[in-house]
Amino acid sequence: SDGKTIDGMSLKRIENLIDALKDESYQPKPARRTYIPKKNGNMRPLGIPSIDDKLVQEVLRMLLEAIYEGSFENTSHGFRPKRSCHTALIQVQKNFTAAKWFIEGDIEGFFDNINHDVLIGILKERIADDRFFRLMWKFLKAGYIEDWTFHRTYSGTPQGGIISPILANIYLDKLDKYMKEYACQFDRGDRRAMNLEYKRYSRKIWWLGTKLKQTKDKDTRKELIDAIKQHQKNRMHLPSVDEMDEGYRRIKYVRYADDFIIGVIGSKSDCEGIKEDI
């Protein structure tokens, strides 16, 4: 940052900032690039904006959140109100229980590689304000300072910027909606077929139970009860449905920031097809 704090910002400075925004003379400063360690041992670049830029970005973030938050998919959990990695894990725990295959995705270098033209095109689908877009272009092209050297930005939105998370969600909302539509096309069957072996044990238990009701002899009743218990014990170790039923397919999807996971009820070839399509 520029070493200044919002607490120390005077009313006059804020008024000057508003005037600069009104006459479009406002020019964001290059972000200060720093690095923080990642879990895998690599370093993650952060772009720290100036105090003035933080303030303006926060206003833009509030505007974008008011426009887009209500239309984001329920499968998106990163950088959203009342959502977190914990809500993402809860959704996985709740919806992925029957999944047999998993596809994990991590969009490498996502924040640094967001296509500016594509991003602006997505924003223009909902926003019609030329002044807004002129300001947005200024932020996207502001560049960054690293080791006292200025670097231009041709793509991406810097991690560390207040506006970057919601821009990322707006960008990746296209993926979320694609996966929602993909699931509608992929899913097949109302329910899985019953496991034939499970069904056979159930029929035996029913038949023995019927016979038990009709039997008075104590020794015979004991034999029937023991047989029923044994069949119930054997059935407990079996799934009630056919887990390899080709007539039943489902796909589940959850995203947190630029990481996503897909759970698949289907075949290995189904998974390979999904990877190709994505």
Role assignments for model-derived ranges:
Residues 1-278:
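Non-catalytic terminal/accessory segments
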